[in-house]
Regions:
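Two-component/phosphorelay signaling modules centered on CheY-like receiver
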Residues: 11-30
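Acidic catalytic/metal-coordinating carboxylates
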Residues: 34-37, 60-63
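Active-site beta3 strand of CheY-like receiver
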Residues: 45-51
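Receiver (REC) domain active-site loop signature in two-component systems and cognate sites
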Residues: 56
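Short, conserved "switch-loop" micro-motifs in signal-transduction and mechanochemical regulators
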Residues: 83-84
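C-terminal output helix
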Residues: 105-114
């Protein structure tokens, strides 16, 4: 079981991810609606894993990943994004993301990616 921070500006997407994660035995310790809040909650809760949208207000997901990765390079971050452009995904991975999931997704994709990240840790 992982302690997970879910970050997405869509309340619906946060709810969907939270449901999938809890149904599969993980603990969602906090939810963020923007990158700035994601960084604050990361510092407060010290999650094992973070799901992070790219396009968010106040601070985008890539900038948040850079800050989080600089503070703790061991935390695993999975980008969950509707942006399927390879250049954007490559930028997120260079910033410190561990993997990515392109929206729309299904529960099995989410869990396969999380299980892969957790088991490689």
């Amino acid at each position: 079981m992982a302690r997970i921070l879910v970050c997405d500006d869509s309340a619906f997407m946060r709810m969907m991810l939270k449901r999938i994660l809890i149904e599969n035995g993980h603990e969602v310790i906090a939810e963020a609606g923007d990158g700035r809040q994601a960084v604050q909650l990361f510092r407060q809760f010290k999650p094992d894993l973070i799901t992070m949208d790219i396009t968010m207000p106040k601070m985008d997901g890539i900038e948040a990943v850079k800050i989080i990765h600089e503070e703790n390079p061991l935390v695993r971050i999975i980008m969950v994004t509707a942006i399927g452009q390879r250049a954007v995904i490559t930028e997120a991975l260079k910033a410190g993301a561990s993997d990515f999931i392109v929206k729309p997704f299904d529960a099995s994709q989410v869990m396969e990616t999380i299980d892969k990240i957790i088991n490689n840790n």
